[in-house]
Amino acid sequence: RRGALSETPLAELIPDAVDEVGGPTILATFTVIAALLPMAFVSGLMGPYMSPIPINASMGMLISLAIAFIVTPWLALKLLKPQGAGHGEEQGETRALRLFRGVIGPFLGGAKGGAARMTLYTGILVLILGAVSLAGLKLVVLKMLPFDNKSELQIVVDMPTGTPLEHTSGVLQEMGSYLATVAEVTDYQAYAGTSAPINFNGLVRQYSLRQSPELGDIQVNLADKHQRSRQSHEIALAVRPPLEAIARHHGASLKVVEVPPGPPVQAPIVAEVYGPDYAGQIAVAQKLRADFIAAPDIVDVDASIDEAAPKLRLRVDRAKAALMGVAQGDIVAAIRIGLAGEDVTPLHESGAKYEVPVRVSLPPEQASRVESLLRLKVRAAGGNLIPLSELVFAEKLAREQTVYHKDLLPVVYVVGDMAGKLDSPLYGMFEIRSRIMGKPLAQGGSLGEYFISQPDDAYAGYAIKWDGEWQVTYETFRDMGLAYGVGLILIYLLVVAQFKSYLVPLIIMAPIPLT
């Protein structure tokens, strides 16, 4: 523009042109930085995912500012051709002015444009309400983070309590045989009686505690995402029904666990049950679990409730053992050998690279029967061999319930996932909520509900606190809202410094709530 209106050499025009736009450019740069920088202070597990955004964006804006003041003027000097003074823009300005008057004119003119302005405001309000209602009408799925396309899945299997390790391994092999038929699966590894190698997701879900014969994991590796047409989430949805059929046949429960795109949670949908009595909490959780199962599209339902199972306790008759001259340590050692075995000596082989232990134990089919165990003999002080059945008696008990705690409060967890048309845990959470709230409890009263924090008095009555992906969503939007509030204050101060006015920045920033 300056070149077209003046015959001054381009090298002399460029500094004035840069000075003309320099102030607004600097203001815009630091305004963007002020808007993004508070995101670096988002707390919780979402913080590490958010912090690169303000850092990288701020660096990009500063680099962009340097390019605007250094590189762009130099390129303009090298590439632009000198132009003589003229009035080439008058016609363009006339067309632009005509367009401006045609669009803006009806809204100006004081009282004359009042009806048009009211129509504009009403239209904007209707559009805002329509946009907000899209999530409520389920035309747009409200979800914290989209599904990622990872190259792995994890199958978590829980067999009935007391299932032998061999049976668990057999079920995993049956599932593995099916997984081998899936085109996108390159390989898999089954782990019976223990957990797969712990990843970040497993660390939060405490998979390291999965050490029992009835527990199993299958680590499934998929082809590279560039070598397959289906997303990993689509594959997970496709393999779940056949795997669930195998699990139901063996009385097992199954979870298809995907690597989350953001911070991991215990489960996408988590209900924490609090109350004055743990037995009552378990009863409430069992009813809640039934509501989870009955809700449409809710899968992978589980609860932190141990199955009722018998337990056998072996007690030593101390008086009789002392009378026969048998040490209690010898009795315990014999029982340990029968149940778990013991390495008694290494096998000496000249060609062996590592020590080969010689293990003494009962055959597996006998180790599982207490009668076989009690037929083992220990040597008394006089040299006689005495069977354990004369010194040990078995007590049949019920298995104790594991008591979980969170922030020192006893809690029972009920968890689930969403897999259906909506595929967002928030919709599943509110579907379950509509089924349980307002109904009387068998223990008396109604169930309390908390979304943000635990009950102030967890022993006053039974209540649930929603957790999982909802908690991450709430904390993220809470922190981001506070961060953008600070950002707006910084933007306001920058604009005040630019225009030397406290009112003009408010007018300039008025459209921000509409974005």
Enumerate the predicted regions with their spans.
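Transmembrane alpha-helices and their membrane-interface boundaries in multi-pass membrane transporters
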Residues: 1, 22-41, 48-90, 218, ...
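Helix-loop junctions and hydrophobic alpha-helical segments within the transmembrane domains
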Residues: 2-27, 97
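Hydrophobic alpha-helical segments of integral membrane proteins
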Residues: 10, 14, 46-49, 53, ...
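Loop-to-transmembrane-helix entry motif
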Residues: 17-28, 53-56, 60, 103-116, ...
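Signature of alpha-helical transmembrane segments and their immediate interfacial
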Residues: 19-21, 89-143
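Interfacial segments of transmembrane alpha-helices in multi-pass membrane proteins
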Residues: 37, 41-45, 347, 378, ...
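Surface-exposed amphipathic alpha-helical segments in non-transmembrane regions
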Residues: 112, 130-139, 154, 167-187, ...
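Short extracytoplasmic/periplasmic juxtamembrane "stem" segments immediately C-terminal to an N-terminal membrane anchor
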Residues: 147-162
